[in-house]
Amino acid sequence: MSDVSEVTTSTWDDEVIKAQGLVMIDFWAAWCGPCRIISPTVEELSKEYSGKVKVLKLNTDENSDIASRYQVMGIPTLMFFKDGTKLDQIVGVVPKQFLKDKIESFLNK
């Protein structure tokens, strides 16, 4: 069972834009092999940063308007928002430690 909630077009503003604090969104699709590779890392980070970082997943096939709005050209894309403002995005599979370092830098700003 996943600890990571799904965000959709209809919940995007409430879950991401109006959220206080750091939010990490995993843009993915069911057919995407690299998305399946990074998914366990996203789950682990959700547990490790519980209460500090809101971790969400967005299915790009079902919510293509959000993916288009933020110009997501490749998946997986991990996007970071803080207090409703986009901070950064990472495209592709990256090591867990890289993501932890990125999260820590955003939490300490």
Stretch-by-stretch model annotation:
Residues 4-23, 64:
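A short beta-strand-turn-helix
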Residues 20-22, 37-58:
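Conserved helix-turn-beta segment immediately C-terminal to the redox Cys motif
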Residues 21, 28-31, 74:
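Short pre-active-site segment immediately N-terminal to redox-active cysteine/selenocysteine motifs
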Residues 27-41:
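Conserved redox-active cysteine motifs that mediate thiol-disulfide chemistry
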